[in-house]
Amino acid sequence: MAKQLLGKEVTAALNERIKADVAKLNEKGIKPTLGIIRVGERPDDLSYERGATKRCETLGVEYKKYLLPANVSQEELLKVIDEVNNDDAIHGVLMFRPLPKHIDQKVVENALAAEKDVDCQTEASLGAVFTGQKVGFPPCTPQACMEILDFYGIDCTGKKAVVIGRSLVVGKPAAMMLIQKNATVTVCHTRTVDMPSVTREADIVIVAAGRAGVVGAEYVSEGQTVIDVGINMNEEGKLCGDCDYAAVEPIVDAITPVPGGVGSVTTSVLVGHVVEAAMRKYA
């Protein structure tokens, strides 16, 4: 039976670090604050917003919402971004995506000040993931994966790591972050030939395929650590990951469950970025 890499244990440790940093800021009269920009009322956005605001409240971080109708003009949205960019009381900004089709998402994303970009929405932040510079922040989900590896003492140095998925949101940043941990990294994707033969050779597998249960027993081998980023609904309406958990779990050494794995860490990473942004500003 594989060891379960439980997100709640990682989150508890991360939250204690964040609370300590918030206390230091409060001593200086600084209240770390997240600006939340939401266009429309997509159910996924509303759900994540509830989780983010609840975590902010738990950790002593304030938030301010900027709620806009789905038919808002690009000009009006850019005005809001300019407002939060110039508001010294706002330290980090979360803008929900995707934006409505009538808005040029790239233009709007890159209008955000990089130092307030707590979920890697700007090209400046994304570039910093590859250069290692402290400009903006990495995407919250791949950083949550790294937090899990660190918490459970899984050393990446010299290890073979495979990332399934090449998106700019998870796959590519996760690969770069593993390289920074001195792993030897292979990225698999929809055009990879005989993917199971590649993934079986890995010590660490991060699965961000975006399809429920796509990674089965043939993809894994004994001794592996598997981080499942996927969040999907199965035919029974239950949350499940990109791994076929029942098939994979008996084989590997350690695995994150879904739910209860990566997703539960991501929100604390986001709030931690807000606090770090405030600390950078007033360092």
What are these regions (language model features)?
Residues M1-I30:
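Positively charged, low-complexity intrinsically disordered leader regions
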Residues K31-G40:
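Short beta-strand segments enriched in small/hydrophobic residues
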Residues V39-T53, G136-T225, N234, K238-E249:
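Glycine-rich phosphate/diphosphate-binding loop of Rossmann-like nucleotide-binding domains
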Residues C56-A70, V185-V187:
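Short beta-strand elements in bilobed, periplasmic/extracellular small-molecule ligand-binding domains
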Residues E76-D88:
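Short, well-structured alpha-helical segments in soluble
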Residues G92-C156:
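Anion-binding alpha/beta catalytic cores of soluble intermediary-metabolism enzymes, centered on
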Residues F96, A208-A209, V229:
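Short, well-ordered coil/turn residues at beta-beta hairpins
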Residues K106-L126, G230-Y282:
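Rossmann-fold NAD(P)-binding glycine/threonine-rich loop
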